[in-house]
Amino acid sequence: MQEETEYINVYGARVHNLKDIDAEIPRNSLTVITGLSGSGKSSLAFDTIFAEGQRRYIETFSAYARNFLGNLERPDVDKITGLSPVISIEQKTTNKNPRSTVGTTTEIYDYLRLLYARAGEAYSYLSGEKMVKYTEEQILELILNDYKGKRIYILAPLVRNRKGHYKELFEQIRKKGYLYVRVDGEVREALPGMKLDRYKNHDVEVVIDKLVVADKDDTRLKNSVAVAMRQGDGLLMVLDAQSESVRHYSKRLMCPVTGLSYREPAPHNFSFNSPQGACPKCKGLGVVSQIDIDKIIPDRGLSISGGAIIPLGKAKNSMIFWQIAALLEKYEATLKTPVRELPDDAIDEILYGSDERIKIKSSLIGTSSDYFVTFEGVVKYIQMLQEKDASATAQKWAEQFARTAVCPECHGAKLNKEALSFRIHDKNIYELSTMDINELYDWLMNVDQYLSRKQQQIAVEILKEIRTRLKFLLDVGLDYLSLDRSAVSLSGGESQRIRLATQIGSQLVNVLYILDEPSIGLHQRDNLRLIHSLKELRDMGNSVIVVEHDKDMMLAADYVIDMGPKAGRLGGEVVFAGTPQQMLRTHTLTSRYLNGECAIEVPAERRKGNGHSLWLRGARGNNLKNVDVEFPLGKLICVTGVSGSGKSTLINETLQPILSQKFYRSLQDPLEYGSIEGLEYIDKVVNVDQSPLGRTPRSNPATYTGVFSDIRNLFVGLPEAKIRGYKAGRFSFNVSGGRCEACQGNGYKTIEMNFLPDVYVPCEVCHGKRYNRETLEVRFKGKSIADVLDMTINRAVEFFENVPQILNKIKVIQEVGLGYIKLGQSSTTLSGGESQRVKLATELSKRDTGKTLYILDEPTTGLHFEDIRVLMNVLNKLVDKGNTVIVIEHNLDVIKMA
């Protein structure tokens, strides 16, 4: 092996399916690890190199600190040398916080807040006038000039437009020795026991002094101004005794017309996550929750007794239905009247209640006399459950009848009026955060010429920081995002590239970066900019490892490691390591696709479709410009375009929610659109995404596809099981009976080590088999249920060749290229691409009407050229049966087959 310091050397890696491999990765270079889906790329990059790097870093902490950091198992590897500190940038969209935005994640918004706090100009939100502020000397000067020889009152404002009787306040004023106050514009004597109408809004000022302004240096005026400033917390008013006109003066920012004043701005005043800056109505979220009547009464053809009001369900013998029945009597209707035949007033009363008392007859409730109540309404009932003190279950239940709407107070800006009144070159901070990054960068490059000399001096360093960070975002192809874009709505590829831009911005050196398919979701155009950014990271003195299938990325790399030869058990070896030029001369599966020996062929002829179309008209969500789109049915349709062009908005956020609402009464609201036509030509919609099959390690391909039920039924029918009286539950590892109770069917035990990582050891009772001894004694063709779960799909296809019900379901998993995974493999160990193909296989094995619409978002994520060929065969099978497949994709091999 080479000199160790120039290379990262991995010896004897055995994580997952790696076959005791050695690997050598040059430092300070761009290395691509490629190979089939499931060949061991991520096992080498993330589960071995990154896991060991992170573990070594955590080892440097004290035992006390390690206690809080959770499990970091030592990867199964002999040793790794030459390892630098490791930073992993994965695709997972980890951020589920609705307050997190592109601006806050990249910290650009923090710099903008600083810019506005230090260099922003304040305007009054009442009059639009520019705010002014004075020193005490300037105020004195102004009064001497403006009121020379006039009789004036010096006032200190104490209450501005607030309710209350203010009895205690007047008492305090009298104790301080002041004789007069000005209440709601009228000067009065401060009398003992004085108080105001507590339910009205009032303005109260204390009269500090009444004097005639002299034309020379006036000591009395000077003292009165100082006292008024103290009493009025930096504000004072001057009342002209003759004309009764008032002027406002302040040490703080103040509107010269209305007297409105702002506190000195600080960065937190521009943060929607701080009470000082957030809009008081929506608490800085920009949206509020509103009850959606269409979700309460989705079908007006039903009657109330037939369940038209979803929160109430069908009519029962209960108080709420007696109340509604009594309420309907005055409209000459009953609970059996369809809602569409009820007058609007009746529906309004049912929803929003009324103050009128309703008579409930004694015969109904079995009492001696009639009963009178007021009905609060269904909406009020749901709103009560949304309150903070309701239980989490009740809140969740109520939430399904609500929809989010733009906050009526801040109109989505998230900030309070004061924060939005600070401007730089006519723009407030919200207007900057809604610009796309390209536009914002141009604006900031030209803003200097509009700033005063003082503003320029203050802003120079802040602007430099913001421009640098924006430039990094532009370099990784994110020019179409805006700073106020919610982090939750970003795709995996986008959030990964944002983290990449942040890392380039951090200017670290001697670090090992590991990235997981950064080119996901990137159009070919943006890909070159991404490669340039990765090379920039390398040229700063870092090592970069990229797990990637992209042809351009492989050819631009300094070094390529190709994993294979196949996937799963048949993979886990290094089939090639060297430069891209050397790779083109070899005969690995990857190199054959790169040098053109293998290719995905263009179809000889295109499908005609079934003659029908689905039309979506007037789509205008996010950045869509009122578009009309035709989807011809019975075809493979590819939706493509540069990053941020609106593909996901059109399909995932508009079309799919419309169809889900129509077919499954889904509660997800589509974005704005005009109309949809042609729904009668499809009968179901299936969204096949890359999310995990299940949330727990107990879910696996057998349980997800439903074949596990068939396998359990097969075992129940065996003579041995019948003699013992076993039912299907006996062969489940999720319920007690047949499972091993020592490990509760997990197959392993977790041993808590307190300040060391938790250790997972095979259960000493069942030795990882999950079932108890009696259950394992029932065998089919010599194999127990645990043996069956441990089989690969390829082996299971041979094993069950004479059991058509099981064979049909697992054969399809084999056909989508997953013959190497095990039937009982935990779904948490499957990659995104593998999970998606298990879902596709499940759909393929279902009874098929030929009128299904399938939606796939970037299905080639994580797939090698060969995997894409297999995937396209599967999709073509679906379309050949008459179904329609819509694919959002940038991959040219997929586009050319559409």
What role is predicted for each listed range?
Residues M1-A898:
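Conserved phosphate-binding elements of NTP-dependent enzyme cores
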